[in-house]
From Swiss-Prot:
Keywords: Aminoacyl-tRNA synthetase, ATP-binding, Cytoplasm, Ligase, Nucleotide-binding, Protein biosynthesis. A motif ('HIGH' region) lies at residues 9-19. One of its GO terms (molecular function) is zinc ion binding. The lineage of its organism: Bacteria, Bacillati, Cyanobacteriota, Cyanophyceae, Acaryochloridales. The keyword Nucleotide-binding applies. Its EC number is 6.1.1.17. Catalyzes the attachment of glutamate to tRNA(Glu) in a two-step reaction: glutamate is first activated by ATP to form Glu-AMP and then transferred to the acceptor end of tRNA(Glu). This is Glutamate--tRNA ligase. It comes from Acaryochloris marina (strain MBIC 11017). Monomer. InterPro entries: aa-tRNA-synth_I_cd-bd, aa-tRNA-synth_I_codon-bd_sub2, aa-tRNA-synth_I_CS, aa_tRNA-synth_I_cd-bd_sf, Glu-tRNA-ligase_bac/mito, Glu-tRNA-synth_I_codon-bd_sub1, Glu/Gln-tRNA-synth, Glu/Gln-tRNA-synth_Ib_cat-dom.
Amino acid sequence: MTVRVRIAPSPTGNLHIGTARTAVFNWLYARHHQGTFILRVEDTDEERSQPEYTENILEGLRWLGMEWDEGPYFQSERLDLYREAIQKLLDQGLAYRCYCTPEELDEMRTAQKERNEAPRYDNRHRNLTAEQEAAFQAEGRQPVIRFKIEDDQTITWKDLVRGPMHWQGRDLGGDMVVARATASGEVGQPLYNLAVVVDDMDLNISHVIRGEDHIANTAKQILLYQAFGGTVPEFAHTPLILNKEGRKLSKRDGVTSISDFQKMGFTAPALANYMTLLGWSPPDATQEIFSLSDAAAQFDFERVNKAGAKFDWDKLDWISSQYLHGLPLAELADALMPYWQAAKYDFDPVADRPWLDQVTALIQPSLVRLKDVVEMTKFLFTRELTWSEDAQKQLSQESVAVALQGVIDPLAAAAESEFSAEIAKSFINSTVKANKLKKGLVMRSLRAALTGDMKGPDLMESWLLLHQRGEDLKRLQQALEIASA
């Protein structure tokens, strides 16, 4: 079998993490079987679909490294195809016009609720006479098109993730609306289940891979495949992504779109790596870092979990850190540059590039997200240092002024070319010995004076970087004023 899969997002919002994870699984399966990965944009919702969302979705997929082999196909450009299919159902007596008003449907559901029955359409307009239809039309009623679903129909399929699935027609909510109403009485806007089946048949989709929240839709769609005489594809219903409370991840949980993750400073390979693990386990359970290509070579549905996949920020951060720590220095510096520029830090990206590479090397072992670099390196770029409360407490301790003065004097006298880490250490050792100070006091005081905080990257490397900017002596002198106050 030639594998043809599709990702079919709706442009009613930015690319969601759930849709992106579904895209990852489709892409992995296609690549594993040397198949075709197709992009279809389901933009039939005219009110909610927006061009900017379409662009966001396409950009997000490209950014993640999931280029499609065919498409994008747009459902809004295929409406005639759907209407032809609906007319075929009408002509064959498999669908009909339903003239129920919203008020009548509400009354029906209310009565069902009072009887403790599940809400469903009672198929009351399935067998209208021509006279009844004419009477409804004379009232100005606008009909929807409903596809007939018999209560005694049995729908079965072997799900690639969940195994044998069984549904009864009576559990599908009655005859299904496949097209909206129109004032003219013509076939209106085709709805999701109809359009999906027509597209999947037309595009020869072999496998439909999507979230478990579509299982009920699958039962309905199989009936449509059978009605059209089409080949029913294989189905794989993947686990939902859950929040920490075990509920489906939603916008209420905050960050959910791929562009949000980009803004937070996650790289595409790290995020794609993490999404691969949201519901799938590699054969080697200890392997957690791999490229999409590596994952594709190992991917199969036997290792896709049935249970929901909880979104774990700590795990994502750890994976992100592994990628950042392993990036070549120049590549990481290039990735950090936009964050420094957005923060309006004072530097020349060309003239200061050697210094920026050193800054990158300093913070790389501690970097978790690209965006973290803004706060981590602020003390290196700023010309007006602000001392934290902890740093000021350190500077106010006894003997700190003596310690700082013992470093300032030789530093001020040293020639630019003479300064190095070894020389800096000699200044520290000399003031410790000459003033009978504890080395820890001197080191803590220098950190407070030079960085404005009591924690941060390696002190000596930070000092050298500040010296190159001509900032170290100035800061030590300012800190001495605080210590002497």
